[in-house]
């Protein structure tokens, strides 16, 4: 990919974040997400790429979402696959809580695992523990191996995990080992990036979250030279084996089979992101551990964006000032 595309993709996540921010704290996560989707699509279609959404917001019949298989861009330029999460943390945006982001990852054609929208077990570490993780092993063994690689005792190891009932037993297990556990309400993409940031105290991300978010995480972890294992899980294996969950879970398993993916098999980082020639952009909507949130006074807004180019392993933090009433009219509808 041409390196100048990076700044174009930062504009895409900035616009999605500004659109989502318009609905900050209003209790309507679906409207916030829809606004971010529309803004992201408008900006993507202005970029000189022949792009295909491979991780998106829904299936082909679920417009106006950015659906899997949708073509974006002008059709001229590099052929790329795109993984999007227009708002990573829709509930946090709706409730005015921390760590909401607009996220985009772009790679060469065939770069990303075309994961179904289902659950994924994830284990992520930074460069210092690369090659030490294996989801086939018990979690305790993995944590000991990571701690050894980092040259620290378990008592100094920090693990981030989503604060969900399904993780209660795992959190207790880790705390009994002496590990420090940060339980966060949502937003495991941001938490996964923190494992690879030099100034972060987070060593490990573990837990069960969304598979699409897992592929987005894999893209940025590959770009930052970290490591990740994933395992696709059917809904009834995560949420409980009742009739409804079983019905949905069987549909997920059928989709995996049709896509040639084996659920329950451990996926390595190279299975999910097959190249480090990726561009990742994330813009903060609300203030968080990774990025500042949007600040807006009248028609002037300030954003902070994390822009990573994997091929050169360049990490940029971009602070931008936006005069919203100077944006294109079709964008003003979503951000003003």
Curated annotation (Swiss-Prot):
EC number: 3.1.3.11
Source taxon at top rank: Bacteria
Cofactor: Mn(2+)
Enzyme category, top tier: hydrolase
Subcellular compartments: Cytoplasm
InterPro entries: FBPase_class-2/SBPase
Function: Catalyzes the hydrolysis of fructose 1,6-bisphosphate to fructose 6-phosphate. Is likely to be involved in gluconeogenesis during growth on glycerol. Also displays a low activity toward glucose 1,6-bisphosphate, and no activity against ribulose 1,5-bisphosphate, fructose 2,6-bisphosphate, or fructose 1-phosphate.
Protein name per Swiss-Prot or TrEMBL: Fructose-1,6-bisphosphatase 1 class 2
Lineage of producing organism: Bacteria, Pseudomonadati, Pseudomonadota, Gammaproteobacteria, Enterobacterales
């Amino acid at each position: 990919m041409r390196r100048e595309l990076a700044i174009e993709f930062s504009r895409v996540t900035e616009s999605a974040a500004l659109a989502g921010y318009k609905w900050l704290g209003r209790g309507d996560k679906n409207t916030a997400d829809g606004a971010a989707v529309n803004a992201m699509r408008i900006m993507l279609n202005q970029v000189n790429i022949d792009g295909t959404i491979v991780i998106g917001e829904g299936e082909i019949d679920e417009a106006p979402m950015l659906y899997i298989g949708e073509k974006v861009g002008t059709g001229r330029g590099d052929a790329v696959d795109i993984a999007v999460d227009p708002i990573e943390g829709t509930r946090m945006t709706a409730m005015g809580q921390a760590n909401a982001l607009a996220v985009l990852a772009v790679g060469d054609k065939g770069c990303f695992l075309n994961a179904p929208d289902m659950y994924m077990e994830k284990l992520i570490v930074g460069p210092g523990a690369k090659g030490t993780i294996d989801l086939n092993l018990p979690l305790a063994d993995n944590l000991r191996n990571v701690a050894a690689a980092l040259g620290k005792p378990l008592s100094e190891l920090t693990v981030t995990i989503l604060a969900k009932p399904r993780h209660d037993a795992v959190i207790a297990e880790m705390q009994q080992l002496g590990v420090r556990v940060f339980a966060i309400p949502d937003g495991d993409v941001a938490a996964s990036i923190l494992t690879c940031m030099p100034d972060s105290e987070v060593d490990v991300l573990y837990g069960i979250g969304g598979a699409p978010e897992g592929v987005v995480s894999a893209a940025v972890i590959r770009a930052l030279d970290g490591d990740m294992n994933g395992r696709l899980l059917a809904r009834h294996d995560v949420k409980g084996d009742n009739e409804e969950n079983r019905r949905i879970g069987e549909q997920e398993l059928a989709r995996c089979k049709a896509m040639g993916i084996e659920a329950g098999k451990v996926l390595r980082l190279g299975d999910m992101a097959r190249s480090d020639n990726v561009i990742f952009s994330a813009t903060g909507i609300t203030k968080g551990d990774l990025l500042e949130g949007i600040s807006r006074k009248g028609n002037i807004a300030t954003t902070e964006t994390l822009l990573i180019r994997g091929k050169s392993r360049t990490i940029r933090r971009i602070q931008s000032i936006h005069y919203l009433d100077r944006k294109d009219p079709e964008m003003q509808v979503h951000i003003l």
